[in-house]
Amino acid sequence: MALLQIAEPGQAAAPHQHRLAVGIDLGTTNSLVASVRSGQSVILNDEQERSLVPSVVHYGVEEKKVGLEAFEQASLDPKNTVISVKRLIGRSLSDVQSRYSSLPYEFVASENGLPLIITAQGAKSPIEVSSDILSRLNHIAEQRLGGELSGVVITVPAYFDDAQRQSTKDAARLAGLNVLRLLNEPTAAALAYGLDSGQEGIIAVYDLGGGTFDISILRLSKGIFEVLATGGDTALGGDDFDHLIADWVIEQTKLKPQTANQQRELITLANQAKITLTNEKSAVISWQDFSVEISREQFNELIYPLVKRSLLTCRRALKDANVESEEVQAVVMVGGSTRVPYVREQVGEFFGKTPLTSIDPDKVVALGAAIQADILVGNKTDSDMLLLDVVPLSLGIETMGGLVEKIIPRNTTIPVARAQEFTTFKDGQTAMTVHVLQGERELVDDCRSLGRFTLRGIPPMAAGAAHIRVTYQVDADGLLSVTAMEKSTKVQASIQIKPSYGLTDEEVTAMIKSSFDNAQEDLQARELAEQRVEADRVIESVIVALQADGAELLSTDEFHHIETVLKQLMDVKQGSDRDAIAQGIKALDTATQEFAARRMNASINKALTGKNLSDIENP
């Protein structure tokens, strides 16, 4: 079945009308555009028959250049040539400056703390730079296809968070593109291989591009593409290999770049050496009157820690998917950096099988995105292909005691909507704050806050009487909306989560790892917090009851006894002995049982006062 068919309301799509749609791989280093033509997904080349468009924009005094022409300006005018903008999109200025301090650009902060790059054509945001790249790809597509595009599918790393995804959509809209869907890059690759090779079973997609790394474990069965688990690193890629070679050259020559131009020149030479080492045993780097030779073995030693880091992420993804490495039937290699022989060798050893490389790793993502775009505009209405992406980190809500109640667990298939009912804690409560959280831990302090909103207008009721339905909805692009509704009045409030900046790769890794490392401690902390919440509830109800009926229904000794036990529970609640708190709750319950019975009898007597038997039998 098709995921979506687009037609005007009340109208059916013309049976033989072919809509123009493309898939775009908006990469860190290079970008590509593809489309389905005559039933086959193909890359659309530019005017010079080049398939790869460098993800580079040069903002000169008089003109703007995008692609290879811009890349050629990188060493001549680095301050006005923006490369690897994908690393910057959706991040705060402080994050960019701390992580990428060696960038040659001059940054200023926007009103909301996002980075703006100072260029000869004014301040440019990462969204604007990305938009210029997308505009170039749009131009190539429309020139090749001979018409205006109906829509596009743009791929993003699986670990892009809400801010990074939303920024990508904003860039596309700024370029005048109709975004049909954002698609995870590994999922797009699986789609391309599933169509071309008819693969079924468990597949690992190892995606190492210029600036990001992703691993996805997928199950392909009878046309259904299901992502079982994902992992990734938003700051690991071929660019890092280049920097390692550059650092090695500096160490060998004892010469550091003195200018931005020299830095860019050295990085370019390092990149060329990396490419040479893909096919040759060694490469010569000539820089500042020095000539040094680096062997493939030396290069392998340099990149070993980064490759190992990627394989540790693979191990975590397999664990999340509850899959053993020997169950993986095929390993798909995606991204230009997977051409490095050492990467292929190590990945093959890890999974115990030779990786698949039959589709060009630079092109496979764009080809898969084009297939999905063709489905989404209704060109392939008989398709039985279904794509199921997943939520990479759990989404939850804060409950009393600083606890996190998970609404959508990590690795849940999207799009998804989940609802859960909550209630008020105090009598007469007319408002409730909904605190949206992301992460794997049990306590609020250990998770990431995504946002808060307040539901007002709850009718005053006894504690626990109100019914608040909270719905979490994640769309196909991974964007989250949360709605809270009081069921009797239908009053509601909502929020759409668009964080001002994204998670760093360290935070993503730490959030997942800490959930394993602290599982036992978290469980104990949760149980303690739950006991404290229960103690607070009991204390609150007893205090209210004493104030209302204590003087009338209790003797002085009984009143003082309950007060004493109540005070003991209030004291023990401040400690960290969960069993002691439970015993205190039980003791207070025992001490107030007779009081509770008297209150019940008094309520019944009050309700029956002045009524006869016939009134009760015939209300």
UniProtKB/Swiss-Prot annotation:
It comes from the Bacteria. SUPFAM superfamilies: Actin-like ATPase domain, Heat shock protein 70kD (HSP70), C-terminal subdomain, Heat shock protein 70kD (HSP70), peptide-binding domain. GO terms for molecular function: ATP binding; ATP hydrolysis activity; ATP-dependent protein folding chaperone; heat shock protein binding; protein folding chaperone; unfolded protein binding. GO terms for cellular component: cytosol. InterPro entries: ATPase_NBD (IPR043129), Heat_shock_70_CS (IPR018181), HscA_NBD (IPR042039), HSP70_C_sf (IPR029048), HSP70_peptide-bd_sf (IPR029047), Hsp_70_fam (IPR013126), ISC_FeS_clus_asmbl_HscA (IPR010236). CDD domains: ASKHA_NBD_HSP70_HscA. One of its GO terms (biological process) is iron-sulfur cluster assembly. PROSITE patterns: HSP70_1 (PS00297), HSP70_2 (PS00329), HSP70_3 (PS01036). Keywords: ATP-binding, Chaperone, Nucleotide-binding. Pfam families: HSP70 (PF00012). Belongs to the heat shock protein 70 family. Chaperone involved in the maturation of iron-sulfur cluster-containing proteins. Has a low intrinsic ATPase activity which is markedly stimulated by HscB. This is Chaperone protein HscA homolog.
